[in-house]
Amino acid sequence: MSPLDSMFLLGESREHPMHVGGVQIFQPPEGADARDVRALLDTALTNDDRGVAPTLGKRARRSWTSLGQWGWDVDSRLDLGHHVRHDALPEPGGEAQLWALCARLHGTLLDRSRPLWETHLIEGLRDGRYAMYTKMHHAVADGVSAMSMLRRTLSDDPDERGMRAPWQPPHPRPPATATDTVSAAGVSDLPRAAVRAAHSAVGELTGLVPALAATLGRAARDQGGPLSLTAPRTMFNEPISGARQFAARSWPLERLRLVAKAADATINDVVLAMSAGALRAYLHWNGALPAQPLIAMVPVSLRDEQQGSHGGNGVGVLMCNLGTHLPDPAARLDTVRTCMHEGKQALAAMSTAQILAMSALGASPAGASMLFGHHPKLRPPFNLIISNVPGPRRPLYWNGARLDAVYPLSIPVDGQGLNITCTSNDDIISFGITGCRRTVPHLHTLTSHLGRELDALEHAVGL
């Protein structure tokens, strides 16, 4: 297990569950309903001769053979009845009830004695659809790899039937063996592994000094990059509890695409500008809008498509000035666009190792808060995380049920009580807002502010 993945286990507590989640909403095929889906899943549970995907069959453990480091061990007695569960919404079965259930599920810890995931089939939606809520520990997968695993369980063909359950491998695989993957060759290979790692690091070390100097210089000039020194204190940057709130909403992706084209920006710039306007309105409504602009940490994926299907974490970060001190939506979008362009130019001049090192520099204060607790007198390194996880770009189905939407749930941490994550699916983009129930009151109002900000951006660019 990598040091980054281990950190997600070390930093976990009752107040800080460290799993990512997602809600997938499906429209059953004509003549079917959620009961038919439940029957399919029950059959897969009782006649499970296909096993589980390798990522879902491993559990975290430490032992003397790994010198106390976290590693992975295959669970040879995996109990699917524990991991796959059924839930039903109370009346009237609307989005408010669905988000409330997902928030409660997202606030509970995963059992570390088992593989670190759960899937919940949720029935009772009043429009006849059904939902699947899945949570997976961040040590197992980040948002990109989790989305890749979701895509592999679905089909382009609405008429395909007999598809495997979401937890099953897409193709037959040889049985796994119980080995600790901290060091495949065991403790005896650790000295040689250390020598190899040191040798490969020598070339990178010489490049870290100028990369560090450039990163510090950009931060001092308040330019985009992996580090910021100007994030203000806000109501989001307080100690958190373990209870969660969640809200979500979708918009046609074409609306964001047209705004981006008119403003010579990217869709992700528009996502950030929508978030900036919504945060400004929310903070102003709460009498808590700071004079300085909020800073968002924006994850940047460093993995390729093949890596994405094997779990794990591979991300760098950029710090983005959201321009929340500016009343004009067009000015906020221009601020975001400029800052992200500067940041991407900075990353383009670095190697992958340098990007990871500078990203660690920018994010390390938040990691320290996660491990040791939030210090209220320290300025936050950033105010919240806003991420955009690419999803499937075409209609996808599971045994004829169409995937209508994917809503991500992420991880608030101590000192960072709010997270905004969005993902695209076919022709829509969905925002998932996860927050500490105590730190972020009335979180659901942010979705209304997002909608109004998109309207304002369209007006600002002449649409």
How should these model regions be labeled?
Residues 14-20, 24:
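TRNA-binding/sensing appendages of the translation machinery
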Residues 1-4, 23-35, 39-416, 420-451, ...:
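Soluble acyl-CoA-dependent acyltransferase catalytic core bearing the H(X)4D motif
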